[in-house]
Amino acid sequence: MTNGKLFFDEAIETMARGDLDALVDERIHYTVNYAYEHSPFYKKWFREHSINAAEIRSHEALLELPIISGQTIREHQPPETMDFEFKSVEWPEVFTLHETSGTSGTPKTFFLTWEDWLRYASKYARIFTSQGFGTGDRVVVCASYGMNVGANTMTLAARELGI
């Protein structure tokens, strides 16, 4: 079980700390603005809390935001409302729909695009590569494949690596 590779995405995984922090901040800024522009919940939430989404530019700024609880999420999706207010893409872009287990009440629903799946798979590919897995190795995924995005994207990552 030696793939000879230390990294799946060497450019990202060996990035200098300052560059990595800058990339994280850039992606946070993008994500917050995307949520504001595309999610009915976040558009209203930012307005109600007098938060200018464009001013959130770093991971430190996230610490200043009010917490959104699981209960808040449940209150902004069916059956409490007529729509999924957290959904931030149009229906044709939704690749899969998932729910949490609902152990603390009504399950919370979330939506993934194909691009989201690829990001999840990339995360698992980095993990597998860092542990020495590569072409010809085998991995046993002991998680449920039903609506568990982890099991499915681990398998996608393994396939990409030839495992």
What are these model-derived regions, one by one?
Residues 1-99, 104-130, 135:
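Nucleotide 5′-phosphate-binding alpha/beta core
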